[in-house]
Amino acid sequence: MTIPSPSLTALDPVEPFDPIVARLTRLHPKVIDLTLERLQRLLARLDHPEQHLPPVIHVAGTNGKGSTVAFLRAMLEAGGNRVHVLTSPHLISFTERIRLAGRLIEEPYLVQLLEECEAANGEAPITFFEMAMAAATLAFARVPADYLLLEVGLGGRYDATNIIPRTAVSVITPIGIDHKEFLGDTLAQIAGEKAGIIKP
């Protein structure tokens, strides 16, 4: 299912002056296309950084994902753990989405990672969020940490964050009716999509 977003604010509010967002939007038009194939191809070209991540806590749901990630991060860091985090959307700067061992990713490093991903991807089609996830995955694989907290962007089963091969914990927050055009018309269908992050 491929649906062009009518505007950058449709599902993922961003600030138009953010240079990272401008770069991603210019090179990779923002399209919602729920599949993992493009990202799998790109990560293979990058030598599979998703295979070298710290233990992952993956959070899906309709309500409370961001709060749950924030609570988990606070608890883990209070216990002395180094924690990577991926959340969305951001408020002011795209760098707010990625924390490396407790600190926001620095813009020059993120640009470097995006350039590496763009070079590996070439002219192949890819979405805004998939390219961002590829860059974040490189960072998470290269910077040591004890845990990685991933917040699902949309749904779960075909969300770009579900590229990870395994999780330490999968968390489902309260589920409601949302994004029916992508996830289904019933609560059961939507729950099934979000439960797609659960792995053996």
What are these regions (language model features)?
Residues 1-32:
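Charged, amphipathic alpha-helical linker segments immediately N-terminal to NTP-binding catalytic cores
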Residues 11-12, 30-32, 36-45, 49-54, ...:
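ATP-dependent carboxylate-amine ligase catalytic core
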Residues 57-59:
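Hydrophobic anchor at the beta1->P-loop junction of P-loop NTPases
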Residues 67-71:
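Hydrophobic positions on the alpha1 helix immediately C-terminal to the Walker A/P-loop
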Residues 162-174:
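Inter-motif core of Ras-like GTPase G domains
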Residues 174-182:
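Conserved Switch II/interswitch segment of TRAFAC-class P-loop GTPases
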Residues 191-199:
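Membrane-proximal helix-turn-helix segments that form the acceptor-binding/catalytic region
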